[in-house]
Amino acid sequence: MQPLLLEIGSEEIPAGYIVPALEALAQALDAKLESARIAHSKPKVYGTPRRLAVILDEVAEKQESVTTEMVGPPKSVAFDGEGKPKVPAVKFAEKAGVAVEELTFQETEKGVYLCAKIQDEGKETLGILQEMLPEIISHIPFPKSMRWAALPGTFARPVFSILALLGDQVIPFEWNGVTTGRQTRGHYFMAPEAIDIQTPSEYVNALEKAKVIADIPTRRKMVKEGVDAIAKELGGDAIEDEELVDIVANLVEFPAPVGGKFETGFLEVPDKVLITAMREHQKYFAIQDKDGKLMPCFVAVNNTQCKDPQLVATGHERVLRARLSDAKFFWDVDKKQSMEDWVKRLDRVLFQKKLGSVGEKVARVEEMAKFLAAAPEINGDPDKAQKAAHFCKADLVSGLVIEFTKLQGVMGKAYASLAGMDAETASALEEHYLPAYSGGPLPRTKTGDAVAMADKMDSLCGCFAVGLIPSGNRDPYALRRQGIGVIRILQEKGYSLSLSAIVDKGLTLVKDKADQNLAETRDKIISFLADRMAHMLAEQGFSKDVIQAAVAISCDDIPYLWKRVAAVEKLKTLPDYEALAQTFKRVANIIKQAAEKGTLSDQEVNPALFEKDCEKDLLEAFTAMEAKVSGLGVDEALLEVAKLRPAVDAFFDDVMVMAEDMKVRENRLALLAGIAGLFGRFADFSRISA
């Protein structure tokens, strides 16, 4: 076994590209070595803005040997009566690369056939890597790639070196004009000299001596600890921002934090504006005091250790002062504007070519928000919801949001509060964008819930109505995320509001823009949302068959769907679950088949047609159970329904459902239909694996 190292040296790669590229590099190398029958250890990745690297501590020096069998022509065709080889035998031996004398015979169902055993001793790993590694480099995915110097290959940024070692040997190949070697380079400013790497085990330590921290978790830890330490020196704590730590860790090769300050006058601007200005443009960490109040100072992370930190801090302060001055200017100008004037300007802002302006969207969202807030299941304030919806997009044309787009909603709330709007309505202007990401926080108020769902459902219904349906990786209007947002609000807030009623309302509001059949569009939207629900339930650990069985009944009441799935999943923990599922499934299948054949009537069960006591016993048990479960919760109700199994099993043991007497048959089917309807409230048990 030998260690393997591949490092691709390049110009500075964007921070967000590095981790996904390293994951793809490791996966590709792992898969290709496996496919090539080369034993190896797990890949370990290293990366900085100027290099992507992978190390495997152990790689076999040769492919694994394998023996394969090749079946040839029938013996009767390949040999004559005296056992001498004929042309087919000779040709087969040549094809297999063996002598005729080495051929064997194999008994098959079709007779005796020639067989050749082919021994593949395996090639040297070094030679295989010469072909494998260039291909892997060529296929590392990036959001955007580029070409340079009229060369054919593409990469995130121009590649200037490739370090490739197997043990102490250079793996010789050329990629896009760059020939491999054993050299890497240290920090661009602090140690720019070339470094010879003799074996992969030297790599990480050699770079560290040259002021490059190649290991991302180590570099990330240095960023976080350094920022926290500087913040303490400034008398506060860095505002927690794990995403910013990730970004900064991949902007530098050797983190060197430094603290700075800004004028207290800027604190007149809302905290989120200042934090966003520091974060988005400068990648600075904001600092707060022990009471959570923003302090007029920050931490910047340099890529170079400096002799005079104060001089560097002064430079950062000068740059930030310009940014904060811009933010304060926009804040002061925006405060003098009328939000109603901004709403009018939305008529000149395009939402989508077929769906019209943002102003038109806002008008639809107002109606939908009012409808949702008025629903008994939500029991909100329709007037507040309509007012919040009216102003929910107003800040999109404000100076601050145009400059800092991530402040949409945040500034809406701030401007509404300045204008004297009540707290719940003002908060809804920010909350209506929630949840902003998978697992993100939900709106905190009913008004926020109503406007958030209204905005998302308008986008869903509108886009589907004009044929803009997500497919594959294409989802330009983030409809999957918006659908999940609606589902989460309904489910986690316990709003048993009819999903189909919401979709119907949304399509009614957008019908004048639609160019698709609305009935078909309705079905597509509900199916789309049902798929999202199934995916969410699967992520929560529920069984696929249980999810499908519950969704097949209905997904109109989303909180109830979650309860049904949980109840059926709980049923699977019972000792007699398999027998129970078989019984329920048998009943469901009989009723389904009868319905498909048209032999299922809607008649009531007639006890006078009973021929056996088990029929009477089952009806009595069913009638008592139906009354009992009506007041129970989903879990208890399903567990009670499960107690019908002995009576159902006795029924199946003692009678033939499909009796020759048509009236008796229909009566028994009616009895089973009642049973199926009782447990069919929870799931379609015909879909559940027993």
Swiss-Prot record:
One of its GO terms (molecular function) is glycine-tRNA ligase activity. Tetramer of two alpha and two beta subunits. InterPro entries: DALR_anticod-bd, Gly-tRNA-synth_bsu, Gly-tRNA-synth_heterodimer. Signal peptide: none annotated. It is an enzyme of class 6 (ligase). Keywords: Aminoacyl-tRNA synthetase, ATP-binding, Cytoplasm, Ligase, Nucleotide-binding, Protein biosynthesis. Its EC number is 6.1.1.14. One of its GO terms (cellular component) is cytosol. The keyword Ligase applies. This is Glycine--tRNA ligase beta subunit. HAMAP family: Gly_tRNA_synth_beta (MF_00255). It comes from the Bacteria. Its main location: cytoplasm. PANTHER family: GLYCINE--TRNA LIGASE, CHLOROPLASTIC_MITOCHONDRIAL 2 (PTHR30075:SF2), GLYCYL-TRNA SYNTHETASE (PTHR30075). It catalyses: tRNA(Gly) + glycine + ATP = glycyl-tRNA(Gly) + AMP + diphosphate. PROSITE patterns: AA_TRNA_LIGASE_II_GLYAB. NCBIfam families: glyS. It is found in: Cytoplasm. Belongs to the class-II aminoacyl-tRNA synthetase family. GO terms for biological process: arginyl-tRNA aminoacylation; glycyl-tRNA aminoacylation.
